[in-house]
Structure formats: structure tokens, C-alpha cells
């Protein structure tokens, strides 16, 4: 349907869908925080699970749409390509959120965040392993790699929840200079207090949440369909378009959510939202295989494996930043963010080279 539309009309549809994702994503993140506080969901359920689902609704919609239409390579590119770019969102938060105060990782330093980053690396490593397995290795519409990714994610959430509550170095350790003064997640309580002051009932909040989810899902489908047609019009590789332009567009909710958290002084939550979303994205391979009835990861191409390695590298840079907590800044960003930006910019040249050789 979209292939027959003019390039101008396709660009308008894509831009409108991107705007819808940005606006709806803002409402979704705010209502999610309010609802998780009112229903007492806790950090694990209300944070890393529910918010990961909410901020990744565009990716979920694109994965479902691509799986139903048989474009499994688009589903793979959407999942793996988005992780590297969503990590670059931390650069945006460092520059426009924290600014000249100090680096983001200096403010957000937490060993729990290091564990979250390790979980991202773990699920991405399994994704690389799964891409090398034969596509005939599937039973009851489930592949070993996609199931292992889901189990790693679930166990990782449990361990992170345990680390936040029971490990003495986290729960009772001394406060370090420059740490955020309030506990992680305090911005959620503030959002709930503001909603109560404005007399926003739970019913109204739920309705806004559902409306935002519906708009985001519909916009995600439009982004995938119009983006694929745009790539065809301009002669650009669909995988390259998906891992750059489309991935940047679907990362808009994370930008909005992160800037809001940093504005309220919740630096750790801002980083956790990115790591939590990145760890959740590979879980969508299980959803894609169930919908399509095929092994999805073996459809990963050179570009997808390249981007997965890039995601691991960028995450590793930030893990070093969490541990060493650099205060020095370059162009309003921490040294780690500067390195991430440089590595990502150079990696785009590699993407072009890979696309040109195929």
C-alpha cells in the first residue's frame, strides 16, 4: 500500500508518526510512573518491566508488524539496531540534561546500574550466538536462543532487585561525593504528588495511559511501513534505514523520559530506563518467533551482528564510566559520553561500507 505513495507524502506520514510517538511517549512515561506508585508495583515491576514495555511500544509494534508480514530481517534490524542508538540517548541526556554541572555517570554512579549494563551485554551475547544456529532449530514456535534470552532477562531482573535490597555495599554503603541526594525513583513519587494536586484520578490516569499506548502502537506500525517505503524510494538499504533513522525515531520516548527524570534530579532512573529498555528489546525475539513460527535470529545479517557488537561496546564504555566516575567534560559531556559519540559516528561509516558491499 505505502509503496505506491509519493516520497513527499511518505515523509509527511513518517514525520507525523514520529511526532505522535514523541507526544504519546511523554504521556505514557508520566502515567506509568504515577500508576506504578499508586499500585505499589515496586522498582522491578513498575520500573524495569512496565516502563521498558511502555517506552519500547514503537519497537514492539514494528516487531509485530514485521513478523506478521514476513519481513523478519526488519524485525531483527529493529531490535538489534535500536539498542546501539538508544545507548547514544545517554549522550543526549548528558549534554542537554546534566549540562555543565558534571558528567552523567558521575551523578548516576551506582553498582546496580553496572549490573543492569552487564545484563544488556549478556542478552546481546546470546543474540550473537543464536544468530549462528540453524533456522531449523525450533520447537513449538520457540527457539533455544530466544528462550534463553528471556530467561536471562527474568533472572537478571530478580538479581538486580536483590542487589537493591539485600547487598550491604548497595543498601548501607557510604554516600559518595556528587551522588544524587535523593534515592533512585524519587521522581515517580513527585509525579504522583503533582497528579494528586491537579486532582487526576486513577481512572483518568489509566485512560490516558491506554490512549497513549494505542497511539504509540498505531504510530509504530506507520513508522515501519512508511519507513520501508521511504528506504525503497531513496535507494537506501532497509536495514541501514531501520538501524539509523527508524531507530532514532523510536528512541524519542526514551529521550523524553530521560530528560524529565534528570530535570527532577533522578539521574540513576534516567540511566536505568535506557539499560532496562536495551535489556528488554532482545526479549522481543521470542515474541517474533511465536508470531511468525520461524527462527528469527538466523535472519540476522552482517549489519545486525555489527550493530550488536557496537551495542556491547557502547554499553561497556558507560560501565567503565559508572565505575571510574569521571568529572571532566568535553563539550558539555563526560569523557565516556564523548567516546560513545565518537565511536558511534565512526560506526556509521562502517554501516555504509557494509551496505555497499552487499
Residue ranges and their predicted role:
Residues 1-358:
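Hydrophobic alpha-helical segments, chiefly the membrane-spanning helices
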Amino acid at each position: 500500500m505505502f509503496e505506491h505513495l509519493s516520497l513527499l507524502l511518505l515523509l509527511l506520514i513518517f514525520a507525523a508518526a514520529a511526532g505522535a510517538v514523541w507526544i504519546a511517549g511523554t504521556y505514557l512515561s508520566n502515567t506509568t510512573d504515577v500508576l506504578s506508585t499508586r499500585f505499589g508495583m515496586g522498582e522491578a515491576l513498575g520500573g524495569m518491566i512496565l516502563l521498558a514495555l511502555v517506552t519500547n511500544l514503537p519497537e514492539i509494534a514494528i516487531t509485530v508488524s514485521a513478523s506478521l508480514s514476513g519481513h523478519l530481517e526488519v524485525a531483527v534490524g529493529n531490535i538489534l539496531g535500536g539498542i546501539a542508538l538508544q545507548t547514544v540517548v545517554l549522550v543526549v541526556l548528558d549534554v542537554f540534561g546534566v549540562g555543565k554541572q558534571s558528567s552523567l555517570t558521575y551523578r548516576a554512579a551506582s553498582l546496580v546500574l553496572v549490573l543492569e549494563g552487564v545484563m544488556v551485554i549478556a542478552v546481546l551475547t546470546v543474540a550473537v550466538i543464536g544468530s549462528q544456529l540453524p533456522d531449523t532449530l525450533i520447537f513449538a514456535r520457540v527457539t533455544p536462543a530466544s528462550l534463553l534470552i528471556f530467561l536471562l532477562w527474568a533472572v537478571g531482573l530478580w538479581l538486580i532487585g536483590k542487589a537493591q535490597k539485600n547487598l550491604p555495599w548497595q543498601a548501607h554503603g557510604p554516600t559518595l561525593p556528587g551522588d544524587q541526594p535523593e534515592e533512585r525513583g524519587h521522581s515517580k513519587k513527585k509525579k504522583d504528588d503533582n497528579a494528586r494536586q491537579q486532582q487526576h484520578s486513577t481512572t483518568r490516569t489509566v485512560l490516558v495511559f491506554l490512549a497513549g499506548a494505542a497511539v504509540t502502537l498505531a504510530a509504530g506500525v506507520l513508522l515501519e511501513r512508511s519507513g520501508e517505503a521511504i528506504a525503497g524510494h531513496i535507494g537506501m538499504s532497509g536495514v541501514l534505514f531501520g538501524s539509523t533513522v527508524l531507530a532514532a525515531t523510536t528512541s524519542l520516548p526514551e529521550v523524553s523520559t530521560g530528560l524529565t527524570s534528570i530535570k527532577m534530579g533522578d539521574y540513576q532512573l534516567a540511566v536505568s530506563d535506557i539499560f532496562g529498555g536495551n535489556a528488554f528489546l532482545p526479549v522481543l525475539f521470542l515474541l517474533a518467533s511465536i508470531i511468525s513460527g520461524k527462527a528469527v535470529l538466523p535472519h540476522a545479517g552482517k549489519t545486525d551482528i555489527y550493530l550488536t557488537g557496537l551495542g556491547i561496546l557502547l554499553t561497556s564504555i558507560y560501565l567503565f564510566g559508572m565505575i571510574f566516575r569521571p568529572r571532566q567534560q568535553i563539550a558539555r559531556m563526560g569523557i565516556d559520553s564523548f567516546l560513545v559519540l565518537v565511536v558511534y559516528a565512526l560506526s556509521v561509516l562502517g554501516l555504509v561500507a557494509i551496505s555497499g558491499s552487499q
